[in-house]
C-alpha cells in the first residue's frame, strides 16, 4: 500500500491565489536546471487545482499508484479577506470530499492558531466534520509551540488528532524562523497524545534538527515532500542525505509526501514514487537501502501513524 502523507486540497483556485505558489515552483525548477514557463504553469494551476469534490485527486492517485492520501487545507490569518467563516467552509468541503471517497482520503484541517476562533474551529472539524487532525503553516508568522497554538493543541490532544506542521525555509514572505523543527520540541512533552509530522523534515538542507528530535521523541515523524527536487538534481546527494536521516532518526520515522498538486507541476507522482522505489538498486555503490526501508517510507510508516495498520492488515 502506497500512502501520500502530504497533499494540498484546494476547493477552488484563481490566478491571484495560484501566482505565489507557482512562483515558488518555478524558483525550485530553475535550481534543478529546468527552464519552466511561468505562464504555462500558472494556467495549468488555475485550470486543475480547484477540486471541491476530490474527484481529480482520486484520478491522480489512481494514475500514480497511490492508495490513500492525506489531504490538507492551509489557513493564513494574514489574509484579511479569508475570514474564519470562509476558512471553515473550506474545511467542511474537505470533510465532504472524504465522505465522497471513503477509504481513500484522510483529511487535516487548515488552522491558523492566531484566530480567536481557532480552538473552536478545530473542535468542529474533528468532532463534526470528521477530519483527523490539523495542518499548520507557522512560516505565516506564528510559533507552533506558543500559547496561541497550545489552545488549539489542547483540542487536538483531546481528540487524539494528528499535527502536520510545515518545517523548512521558504522564499519571502515566509518567516523562516517559525519553520524551525525545534519549535515543535515541547509538544511531545506537553501533548504526548499528538503525533507530529514535520513536513519536509526541516528541508533537505536543514534536516538534522528534525532528526535530533525524531531520534528521541516517539511521537515525532517527518515527510519527504519536496525532497524529490534534490533527487532530480543530484540523486547521489539525495541518497546520502536520506540514508543519514534514516540512520539517525530511525527507519520508522519517515513518510512519503508529494506536496501535490503544487509539486506535480514539475513531474508526475509516479516520478516521485520511483525516486524512492529505486533506492535499493540505483543508490551509489557505497550507500545501501533495503526493500523493507522503501516499503516503510512509501506506506508502512504512514499506516502506523495514521492508525490504518489494523484496517488494512489484509490489504
Where are these regions (language model features)?
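Active-site environment of divalent metal-dependent phosphoester hydrolases
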Residues: 10-13, 76-79, 113-117, 169-173, ...
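Short aromatic-enriched loop/helix-cap "lid" or pocket-rim segments at secondary-structure transitions
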Residues: 13-19, 82-83, 120-122, 176-177, ...
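Generic structural signal for well-ordered alpha-helices
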Residues: 55-58, 91-98, 122-123, 149, ...
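Active-site gating/metal-coordination segments in enzymes
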Residues: 67-179, 228-229
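Short helix-capping segments at alpha-helix termini
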Residues: 99-104, 190-194, 216-219, 249, ...
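Catalytic pocket-lining loop regions of alpha/beta-barrel enzymes
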Residues: 128-133, 141-256
Amino acid at each position: 500500500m502506497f500512502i501520500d502523507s502530504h497533499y494540498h486540497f484546494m476547493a477552488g483556485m484563481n490566478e491571484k491565489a495560484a501566482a505565489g505558489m507557482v512562483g515558488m515552483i518555478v524558483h525550485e525548477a530553475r535550481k534543478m536546471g529546468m527552464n519552466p514557463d511561468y505562464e504555462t504553469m500558472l494556467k495549468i494551476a488555475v485550470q486543475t487545482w480547484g477540486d471541491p469534490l476530490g474527484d481529480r485527486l482520486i484520478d491522480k492517485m489512481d494514475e500514480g499508484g497511490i492508495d490513500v492520501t492525506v489531504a490538507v487545507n492551509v489557513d493564513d490569518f494574514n489574509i484579511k479577506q479569508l475570514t474564519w467563516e470562509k476558512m471553515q467552509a473550506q474545511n467542511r468541503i474537505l470533510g465532504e470530499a472524504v465522505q465522497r471517497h471513503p477509504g481513500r482520503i484522510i483529511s487535516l484541517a487548515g488552522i491558523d492558531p492566531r484566530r480567536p476562533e481557532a480552538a473552536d474551529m478545530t473542535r468542529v472539524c474533528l468532532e463534526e466534520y470528521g477530519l483527523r487532525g490539523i495542518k499548520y503553516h507557522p512560516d505565516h508568522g506564528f510559533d507552533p509551540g506558543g500559547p496561541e497554538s497550545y489552545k488549539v493543541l489542547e483540542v487536538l490532544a483531546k481528540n487524539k488528532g494528528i499535527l502536520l506542521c510545515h518545517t523548512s525555509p521558504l522564499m519571502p514572505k515566509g518567516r523562516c524562523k517559525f519553520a524551525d523543527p525545534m519549535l515543535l520540541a515541547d509538544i511531545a512533552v506537553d501533548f504526548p497524545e499528538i503525533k507530529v509530522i514535520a513536513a519536509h523534515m526541516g528541508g533537505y538542507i536543514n534536516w538534522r534538527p528534525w532528526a535530533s528530535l525524531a531520534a528521541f521523541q516517539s511521537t515525532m515523524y517527518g515527510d519527504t515532500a519536496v525532497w524529490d527536487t534534490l533527487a532530480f538534481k543530484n540523486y547521489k546527494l539525495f541518497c546520502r542525505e536520506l540514508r543519514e536521516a534514516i540512520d539517525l532518526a530511525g527507519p520508522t520515522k519517515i513518510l512519503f509526501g508529494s506536496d501535490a498538486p503544487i509539486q506535480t507541476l514539475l513531474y508526475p507522482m509516479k516520478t516521485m514514487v520511483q525516486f524512492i522505489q529505486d533506492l535499493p538498486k540505483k543508490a551509489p555503490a557505497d550507500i545501501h537501502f533495503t526493500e523493507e526501508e522503501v516499503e516503510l517510507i512509501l506506506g508502512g510508516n504512514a499506516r502506523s501513524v495514521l492508525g490504518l495498520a489494523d484496517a488494512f492488515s489484509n490489504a
